[in-house]
């Protein structure tokens, strides 16, 4: 029997909560930082969080393949893609975790036929979980309480434009800001940027640097469910199943 989106959403939410617990346990202690082949950092928190997420997803839907960042780093990309699969980044913003900036998240997205249909983002230090599984279903859950509905907004007179803190200011970001009258620029780390647009506290997020599909799938599902959009720079909806799971530059926006 194929699990429903509602059951899969609860599995992803459970996985995010289990991952958040172990991440916070490790965050509160001294921890070792190692380097992957691409020289990006990895910690025990990345690995333990990924194990817990995979266990939660496989309990409900063992037939759905899981493409998870640390598994890919250790074993390489899957040879073939199914039409339905999970994309998991167990600790998005590992550098923020290492720097103890609190800017990191847990990203769990479900892809069907090349599009994100379900997403959960956990923000451990804020004790927040954002989730969605279709139009009008985006929610924010605080500290295990009742999920509350959220929606993207039409940009106000002073739109908030988010950018990656890690990659810092760039000419392309400065050029984009020049096209948004009254823009208020706010750099920050992790997939939290998608959540702020989905909940209506930010309006634009242009991304020009490299990202992988597991960085964006959950956030895109949540933003789109909240009434926003995630597109390539030519205006096409960002799709999945690309070579190497790599994204082109993209733009996240609230309601237009």
What residues fall within each predicted segment?
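Glycine-rich active-site/cofactor-binding loop and its immediate structural neighborhood
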Residues: 82-124
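Acidic beta-strand-loop-alpha-helix segment within the catalytic core
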Residues: 108-195, 244-256
């Amino acid at each position: 029997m194929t699990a429903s989106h509602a059951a899969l959403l609860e599995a992803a939410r459970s996985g995010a909560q289990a991952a958040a617990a172990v991440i916070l346990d490790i965050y509160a202690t001294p921890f070792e930082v190692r380097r992957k082949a691409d020289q990006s950092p990895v910690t025990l928190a990345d690995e333990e969080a990924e194990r817990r997420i995979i266990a939660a997803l496989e309990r409900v839907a063992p037939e759905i393949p899981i493409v998870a960042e640390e598994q890919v780093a250790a074993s390489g990309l899957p040879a073939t893609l199914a039409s339905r699969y999970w994309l998991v980044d167990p600790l998005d913003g590992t550098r923020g975790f290492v720097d103890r900036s609190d800017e990191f998240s847990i990203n769990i997205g479900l892809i069907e036929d090349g599009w994100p249909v379900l997403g959960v983002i956990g923000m451990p230090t804020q004790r927040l979980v954002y989730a969605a599984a279709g139009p009008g279903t985006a929610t924010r859950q605080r500290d295990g309480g009742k999920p509350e509905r959220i929606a993207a907004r039409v940009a106000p007179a002073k739109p908030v434009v988010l950018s990656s803190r890690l990659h810092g200011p760039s000419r392309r970001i400065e050029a984009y800001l020049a096209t948004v009258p009254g823009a208020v620029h706010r750099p920050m780390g992790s997939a939290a940027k998608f959540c702020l647009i989905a909940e209506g506290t930010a309006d634009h997020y242009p991304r020009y640097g490299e990202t992988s599909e597991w960085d964006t799938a959950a956030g895109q599902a949540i933003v789109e469910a909240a009434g926003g959009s995630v597109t390539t720079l030519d205006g096409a909806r960002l799709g999945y199943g690309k070579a190497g799971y790599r994204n082109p530059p993209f733009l996240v926006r609230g309601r237009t």
